Curated annotation (Swiss-Prot):
Lineage: Bacteria, Bacillati, Bacillota, Clostridia, Thermoanaerobacterales
InterPro entries registered for this protein in UniProt: ATP-PRT_HisG_long, ATP_PRibTrfase_cat, ATP_PRibTrfase_HisG, HisG_C, N-reg_PII-like_a/b, N-reg_PII/ATP_PRibTrfase_C
Statement: the UniProt record of this protein carries the keyword Transit peptide: no
Organism in which the protein naturally occurs: Desulforudis audaxviator (strain MP104C)
NCBIfam families: hisG, HisG_C-term
GO biological process: L-histidine biosynthetic process
Activity regulation info: Feedback inhibited by histidine.
Chief place where the protein resides: cytoplasm
Superkingdom of the organism of origin: Bacteria
Keyword Oxidoreductase assigned: no
This protein's name: ATP phosphoribosyltransferase
Length: 289
């Protein structure tokens, strides 16, 4: 038996492949293939546009897939949300679907969009949002380069943004946030009802979320003389409590902990002054609480 899994092709592909690699899945694909090889005979991977994955999961063509909440909502896909995987092309944070207008536009509030023309890839989501605000507008599908359409072609856009830099570069300002979206592992309901496929998805969830949790974290090991243990532990942050192990035939101990990578630069000199020696920093692939 195999689990048929859809992964996003395009802007999220590289980050997704890196995540799977850290989770223990080595995906190999050439530029023309949509069927990556994977070092797990129980997985069949298909690459496709993130926009399409929820529909194919909903219809049962795929057992499960990775796509954003925005595209699940756009497709009105009736799927099981198995796991939140909060990552995007450049960061580990959600993206936002925003309404944006030109900096010098007279449009100041959402209600000012009444009767205006809006371009977006997420037509259904945008229409539902405007309807909830009591606004009737012309919402048209954008085939790309959405930011450059304001103000000559449309009055506003609804577009995904991670940092807002692309909007600012095109002299646009955010009028409102329609929703926040992040990648979700979602499953077809029949596949989720299958015990073998559900267990496979749950195992995959443990590994993928562990790999995400490990990003920006490192392990730190050091040797500490017995009379400096309290001093070192006093400055050492940890997820819970550091591991302290007695060294063989010695009054020294080995201390090991996991911490945020950003803390390490400033912490290592402090640990050294507190009495730690033989300090080793190492990367992590997965952190499973």
């Amino acid at each position: 038996m195999k689990l048929r899994l859809g992964l996003p092709k395009g802007s999220l592909q590289e980050k997704t492949f890196q995540l799977f690699k850290k989770a223990g899945y080595d995906l190999q694909v050439n530029s023309r293939s949509y069927y990556p090889a994977v070092n797990d005979p129980e997985l069949e991977i298909l690459l496709m546009r993130a926009q399409e994955i929820p529909r194919y999961v909903h219809e049962g063509v795929l057992d499960a897939g990775l796509s954003g909440l925005d595209w699940i909502m756009e497709n009105e896909a009736d799927v099981v949300e198995v796991a939140d995987l909060i990552y995007s092309k450049r960061s580990q944070r959600p993206v936002r679907l925003v309404l944006a207008v030109a900096n010098d536009s007279d449009i100041r509030e959402v209600r000012d969009l009444q009767g205006k023309r809006i371009a977006t890839e997420l037509v259904n989501v945008t229409r539902r949002y405007l309807a909830a605000q009591g606004v009737e507008a012309i919402v048209e599908y954008s085939y790309g380069a959405t930011e450059v359409k304001v103000p000559n072609l449309v009055d506003a856009i609804a577009d995904l943004t991670e940092t807002g830099s692309s909007l600012r570069a095109n002299n646009l300002r955010i009028l409102a946030v329609i929703l926040e979206s992040n990648t979700k592992l979602h499953a077809n309901r029949a596949a989720w009802a299958d015990p073998w496929k559900r267990e496979k998805l749950l195992n995959l969830t443990v590994l993928l979320t562990g790999a995400l949790r490990a990003e920006n974290m490192v392990g730190l090991k050091m040797n500490v003389p017995g009379d400096r243990i309290d001093a070192v532990l006093g400055v050492l942050p940890a997820m819970k409590h550091p591991t302290v192990s007695q060294l063989f035939n010695s009054d020294w101990v080995a201390i090991e902990t996991i911490l945020n990578e950003q803390q390490v630069r400033d912490l290592i000199p402090i640990l050294k002054r507190a009495g730690a020696q033989d300090i080793i920093e190492y990367p992590l692939n997965k952190v499973i609480p």
